[in-house]
């Protein structure tokens, strides 16, 4: 079985996913904590309250997203290397390991519940992705041209 050379090697994919997840978390954190800081500040200080909330919390949220994305990508590459196939089960298994690894400090019960929850979440995401792929393939299915009408047996009138 030959390796798939159309994709970047796993270390580059891991760094790319970490950076993308960090950016998503940071942008989402700017929006979320900006609104939250604006609403929780007194009337004359709403702008500065929003900015201080953004500066304090948005990088933290970006880092949390980045850790999740990098860890998921690491486990995804590891599962692909072990299973030697590319299918939706890789993401589900990687989600299971990611949820467990992030929750391991909370004890056995928390680790188990987070692993199962993360695997279920990734299962739903993969299922929706497969559903959209099948729908797009069905939309692109070639259709036969319409059949011409059968000639009528009535003579033409002049």
UniProtKB/Swiss-Prot annotation:
Key words of the record: Disulfide bond, Membrane, Mitochondrion, Mitochondrion inner membrane, Protein transport, Translocation, Transmembrane, Transmembrane helix, Transport
GO biological process, one term: protein import into mitochondrial matrix
Result of changing residue 8 to K: Induces abolition of mitochondrial import of transit peptide-containing proteins
Result for mutant: residue 77 to S: Abolishes disulfide bond, leading to destabilization of the TIM23 complex
Keyword Transmembrane: yes
Membrane topology: Multi-pass membrane protein
The keyword Ligase appears for this protein: no
Domain of life: Eukaryota
Post-translational modification: The disulfide bond is required for stabilization of the TIM23 complex.
Any single Gene Ontology cellular-component annotation: mitochondrial intermembrane space
PANTHER family: AT05822P-RELATED (PTHR10485:SF0), MITOCHONDRIAL IMPORT INNER MEMBRANE TRANSLOCASE SUBUNIT TIM-17 (PTHR10485)
Self-association state and partner proteins as the record states: Component of the TIM23 complex, at least composed of TIM23, TIM17, TIM50 and TIM21. The complex interacts with the TIM44 component of the PAM complex.
Note: Present with 1210 molecules/cell in log phase SD medium.
Job description of the protein: Essential component of the TIM23 complex, a complex that mediates the translocation of transit peptide-containing proteins across the mitochondrial inner membrane.
Protein name: Mitochondrial import inner membrane translocase subunit TIM17
UniProt organism field: Saccharomyces cerevisiae (strain ATCC 204508 / S288c) (Baker's yeast)
Gene: TIM17
């Amino acid at each position: 079985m030959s390796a798939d050379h159309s994709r970047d090697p796993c270390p580059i994919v891991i760094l790319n996913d970490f950076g993308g997840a960090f950016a998503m978390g940071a942008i989402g954190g700017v929006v979320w904590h900006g609104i939250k800081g604006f609403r929780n500040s007194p009337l004359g200080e709403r702008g500065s309250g929003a900015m201080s909330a953004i500066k304090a919390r948005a990088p933290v949220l970006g880092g949390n997203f980045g850790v999740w994305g990098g860890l998921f990508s690491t486990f995804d590459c590891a599962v692909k290397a072990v299973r030697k196939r590319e299918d939706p089960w890789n993401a589900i298994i990687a989600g299971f390991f990611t949820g467990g690894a992030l929750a391991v400090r909370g004890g056995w019960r928390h680790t188990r519940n987070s692993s199962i929850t993360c695997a279920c979440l990734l299962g739903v995401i993969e299922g929706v992705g497969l559903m959209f792929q099948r729908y797009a393939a069905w939309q692109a299915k070639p259709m036969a041209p319409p059949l011409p009408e059968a000639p009528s047996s009535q003579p033409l009138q002049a």
